[in-house]
Amino acid sequence: MGKIIGIDLGTTNSCVAIMEHGKPVVIQNSEGGRTTPSIVAYTNKGERLVGQVAKNQMVTNPENTIYSIKRFMGRRFEEVASEIKMVPYKIEKGLNGDARVNISNIKKQMSPPEISAATLTKMKETAEAYLGEKVTEAVITVPAYFNDAQRQATKDAGKIAGLEVKRIVNEPTAAALAYGIEKKHEEIVAVYDLGGGTFDISILELGDGVFEVKSTNGDTHLGGDNFDDEIIKHLISEFKKESAIDLSNDKMALQRLKEAAEKAKIELSGAQEASINLPFITADANGPKHLQYTLTRAKFEQMVDHLVQKTKEPCLKAIKDAGLKASDINEVILVGGSTRIPAIQKIVKDIFGQDPNKGVNPDEAVAIGAAIQGGILTGETKDMVLLDVTPLSLGIETLGGVMTKLIERNTTIPTKKSQVFSTAADNQTSVDIKVLQGEREMAAQNRILGNFILDGIPAAPRGVPQIEVSFDIDANGIVHVSAKDMGTGKEQKIRIESSSGLSESEIDRMVKDAEAHAEEDKKLKENIEAKNTANSLIYQTEKSLKEYSEKISIEDKETIENKIKELKESLEKEDISLIKSKTEELQKASYKIAEMMYKDSSQQNASNQQENGTQNNTSEEGKEADYEVVDEDKK
């Protein structure tokens, strides 16, 4: 079995790690960073950029630079109204009702898994460059509170990137693995995970290599992006008061504000105030306008207090669901860059009655845990067992629009539960089974994961047919449902694919597109190299021609000048095969200059040797004469 890499596919940043000699190692990317921005961009030439290079051009290309795509994974268009307001790129409704991104530079609508696949491909290539071998398998992490559709979308993204996703692991659980890999004693740990776009809290029991999740809770609409958004709204409001100009509809200005807000938020974790200076943010009839503002930590904490408080309720629920008191928890581990905010650390202390443990790197712990899980699957990491839970209850819609739960939230997975139901009307020959996920009592208030029909039921009075419905959740937290007519033995099975999810044919198309992109990237690199070689040759040849023009024949000089002209013309035409052939022709023609250079060099060397020989002889004679004179004196 080859290496299984561990990937933290984050809202803001992603990270990849691997097990080496029994230890997890975080791998640096090609730019030297240990984390990679989860940003994908398309230039006006249709070139795809991923990571830091994509982030570098965000301000000038806001509508074609996609960040925080994780907020749209596995979600229907009508579910993302608040998220749409937070991004400058265009979100549209897909044919199957899901949220998709319209990228104007390539005139294409793309699904969130397809965009996430570009980041996963970057992580895959980072690992391959480090290992020097092909990577095909991965463990990918997701927020603990991700529903089935969001998990399936993450798995689809892996497939599009050419990865077999061996396991989907909850982020807090992965962080606990990173924390507890060398711990031998038993303890109860809370993992408070506030990332760029999601919040999770998980309570785990650690002991003898067993990592058992007791409960989990969270909010998939709360993260560092929301904190940035509060700063942006405040800056827009202050600027409007000062200059009577509203920046909220200026996409380029918003992108600059986004960058400045994120920078200020980070600064305020270590300083009492942050200066925000954005020259030429906009202009009016009187000329350019500049934004200058000093944001204090006190003001920032006042602005985001409602967000900080939103993390409290999920924590209290998780403690209660685990059957514990806050005082029973031995350690609180902080994960995610947003946990560096002092106000967050304060509320954690208030909730749990203790200072949080800062021994785990909040940016790398999740990827490290994913790599450890990869090691468990390959057998490289021994004596460790991970027992995770399903974050939300699962059930079906029954008579009266009620949700009947078959699997309660926080049930250890993998698990299987069955229950017998019957028909609601006389002579009913089929049943429509709606699969639901959520905690509300009525079906309409929960998320429909999917539905299927079991038909061929023999006509009978209502309540007579016996229909067994079984729910099976695998280790990835993905749901499989079956319904069986006990009388006839007829059975219908489905793996739940969200109504907003991708079909197999769509995934296959996206895999092919991703492979084509890899080919395009390779071709683009070759094209750039061919142009660079041509330009370099033109420069060197022109330089040499100037130096040796008097030493080569007029005929050779004209040939070389013509070949330079032809190569320059081919560069303007952007025809790579022509550029390559004209480069070769110029190389051959320029051999005449090389001959002259070599001849010149040989003559120079011969001349130098002759001069050196004369000098050496003179020197030797001088030495001898001196010696003789000295000798004579002595005599």
Curated annotation (Swiss-Prot):
Entry keyword set: ATP-binding, Chaperone, Nucleotide-binding, Phosphoprotein, Stress response
Comp. bias (Low complexity): 601-612
InterPro entries on file: ATPase_NBD (IPR043129), Chaperone_DnaK (IPR012725), Heat_shock_70_CS (IPR018181), HSP70_C_sf (IPR029048), HSP70_peptide-bd_sf (IPR029047), Hsp_70_fam (IPR013126)
GO MF annotation list: ATP binding; ATP-dependent protein folding chaperone; unfolded protein binding
Function (record text): Acts as a chaperone.
Name this protein carries in UniProt: Chaperone protein DnaK
CDD domains with a match to the protein in the record: ASKHA_NBD_HSP70_DnaK-like
Gene coding for it: dnaK
Biased composition (Basic and acidic residues): 620-635
